């Protein structure tokens, strides 16, 4: 099968949507404040965006609550109508995919080809998956003791607060919206302040798709103001968040201090990628390289700790360094480039500081380790060896193109070392031995384990983490259940039914 043709990006794309979206209208912030969103390839301003804060969150939550009232238009819709709206939104994303991916590459910095073939397609898929689920939410009849008819209802949890990260802005906005709407909820979405533009473009498509006013509201703003207001709001029934573990902990605290709102968290990772000597070495080197370098290393489940058996360690390192040196970095609109910039200057500085800490603590820098150029936020693909588990680079989430390669001797040792982390989002094992593969997969403390592959996702399957990598699951029916409350009803009957 030939590779899909990638269209040209939109030249000189005008940033059209920069306002807050409440009740199907674009409005200015209550305060009148704006914030700049920056092109990470150049460091230059793309646009000024309306800066929502507590007052704007209050307005958005009120709109979502009004849309959720029992007598509201939205609540009178059939479940299949909610599915139809999600299908329509997916179709509109497909129709606008070139504009959306151009905008995402400008605002986020990821290569245009990756945006077009990956993120936009994922957004469409997740919307269509949950669109099909909307009219298939069913309860049970229960053979309870006594003269009663007993059944369950699965009801929408209510008003949802969704907070999305900057690494997959459009895809993860759609991933929050889809199950919430399928379940019958309304929501307020706050996109990451680094990358608000595709979420606001999506807002225009929400209105075009025909969603009733107030069902989906999108408020750009800063995390410590708009984000905090959303997580602490007493009229929000559930928070769904993807981002850092530190912010996830604040969300849990906010839930406990307010109304015990339901919480789903998909947080950080330090995922082990284990290579056994019987694996296909060329394949394992390439997949391990992509597992940490793709999206500039800005992936929560990136294979950031590569464990290689001692029998193939030296050759694996040699080939991995050779591959990293060949990885092309530069303008994300140039199809020859595999990596664009990191998302912003803060992230750039964090990555470079952690690289320096690795060198200081005794890790061997095999290649890379420096900023590329002085314009934009580009980092060289970097490989470290001689890393120990006590080093900061081995413990902290770098979220950049930095591969750490460890040596191991046997299965039990590598399982113990792989699990020696506070995270547990994902893991991988490469081997031709099914017994080894299953032993390792079943022993790893991770929500997802890949065998002889990496970063393979299906919306039919749940995704989420053990330990400090999160709480709850997204995708599949597990992800839908997170937006539902289960009610048990007993009806007294004259006789046993």
UniProtKB/Swiss-Prot annotation:
Keywords: NAD, Oxidoreductase. Induction: By cadmium. GO terms for biological process: ethanol catabolic process. It holds the Pfam family Aldedh. Pathway: Alcohol metabolism; ethanol degradation; acetate from ethanol: step 2/2. NAD(+) binds at residues 243-248. SUPFAM superfamilies: ALDH-like. The active site is at residues 266, 300. Its EC number is 1.2.1.3. The record marks 167 as: Transition state stabilizer. It catalyses: an aldehyde + NAD(+) + H2O = a carboxylate + NADH + 2 H(+). GO terms for molecular function: aldehyde dehydrogenase (NAD+) activity. Could be indirectly involved in cadmium-detoxification, by lowering the intracellular concentrations of aldehydes. Belongs to the aldehyde dehydrogenase family. This is Aldehyde dehydrogenase. It comes from Enchytraeus buchholzi.
